[in-house]
Amino acid sequence: MEYIPDLPLSPEFWQSLKDCLVVIDDLWKMAANSTLIGNVFKVYARKVKFSVYITSQFFFEKASESSVIRNNCDHFLLFENYSNQKINKSIVERLDLVKQYKEASSYAYSKPYGYVLITLSRKVARPFAVCSNFFCEDPNNNFIQFFQ
């Protein structure tokens, strides 16, 4: 594990990665305004074979590469948003997963730090796209909750 305090903006850095996970934490504005980071999500991650997670407080914040990043994400981890509940609703409406999200969120958000995981990967069948308790953190429930 390595911590890098700033966003690496060198193509050589991204091309040298393989079989690893990169987490871009709280650098959405900088990442979403970088053509290189847009290419990281669009090209490098698939060709060089590494995974990228990016965190954002506001999913729909506009920037030159924000839609490129959103369109190339396979997984979305949604937490209960007290300040703006419309954000999660807008996300699931765009993904056509409103029914599943309603069920999953009522289960997940009844627990501390509850979340809903949405997977858009073609490797996962659509009925298993929405789940909670993925990491079995609920000691009374050691199985993943899927919502169809």
Segments predicted by a language model, with ranges:
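Conserved P-loop NTPase motor cores
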Residues: 2-103
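P-loop NTPase motor core of the ASCE superfamily
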Residues: 68, 75-77, 81, 86-148
